[in-house]
Amino acid sequence: MQITPAQSSDRESWNIFVKNNYPPVGVFMQTWEWGEFKKDWGKKIERFFVTDGDQLIAVFMLAEHSLPFGFSYGYLPRGPVLAKTLDQQKINAVFSFIRDWAIQKHSHLVFLRLEPPVQEEVVAELGKKHFLRPDYYIQPRYNLTLDLTKPEEEILASFHSSTRSNLNRAERRGVTVTLKNHQQDVSQSDFWQMTKDTISRNSGKNLYPPRTYFNSMFKVLPALGNETSPDQLSIGTFCGHQHDKPAATHYVLFFGDTATYIYGASATECLKSKVTTYLHWQAAREAKARGFKYYDLGGIDEKLWPSITTFKRQFGGLEFAYVGLIDIPLQPRLYKLYNFLKKLRHLGKS
């Protein structure tokens, strides 16, 4: 096996491999465009091919995250991406090879953090080979996704009766949805005003990234257009209005077979219009019309987000579960210190 850096000329082949070999949920995080966005936001990003002879068997994007005292660690968001043709033995060999490579080539990192989009049984034996499994996770381990390959009437029939009722209520109360181009005619001022309402309803807890994050994302990612290719990550801005008044905004990423809801905000005074339910449905319909197979409503977790989880589950759909984090200590003593300090910070907040 061999690991080689990807070059700028490899964008198309990179995205095609990711599209063809990734499960429905989380695919956008290993696209070329997502890496470019993270670069613009200030992250150090590297991309690598894993080959076996003349066969491409895996790819991964490596993002460096700073730690105190000048140290850092490497994070593979929802990666590495493995070829679907690999059997269990070959998958184990790929993980072991990445570990050996990281020890040799990235010794400046304290540890390497993997987040493979695979099921638990695929990595069940990794703990025997110096891989560690943190008891927390970064990306949601569970996502809820609508199957858009079914007829629209069948998708609607799978919704909870209250969800179908809310869709009808939204139309009766004058809710409309427009897909807009963020690079042309969308002002973020409405979105940021509505985030204040959303944060207030969440007991003041802010789950939004800083504005610089959104600025870089909108700067780098192309807007969803009529000729947008599924081989290129793009973003759709779905604006909901009630009687021409801004009521909610959803941002949805499009790539491969999946449209992925990532962020949204809504005006408190318009919540009774059920605009957020209506926005999800119209975004899913847009994705289906464009030939996408899945609409990912995002993470669910009964303990962390009980109300959001209940809301999303009323859409029916498919639930996907992934293994979470796998750490490879490159400097074991510093890795132990990192975990010790992390636990202290957690105790200090509790």
Enumerate the language-model features and the residues they cover.
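A conserved beta-strand-loop-helix scaffold within acyl/acetyltransferase catalytic domains
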Residues: A6-G53, F60-F69, K128-Y137, K150-P151, ...
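Active-site/acyl-donor-binding loops of N-acyltransferases
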Residues: Q7-R11, E64, K128-E153, A289-S350
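Glycine-/proline-rich flexible loop or hinge segments
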Residues: S72-T85, H106-F111
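A cross-family glycoside hydrolase active-site/sugar-binding cleft signature
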Residues: P77, L112-E115, I262, G298
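Acyl-donor-binding surface of acyltransferase catalytic domains
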Residues: K90-T176
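Aromatic (often tryptophan-rich) hydrophobic motifs at membrane interfaces
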Residues: A93-D100, Y213-K336
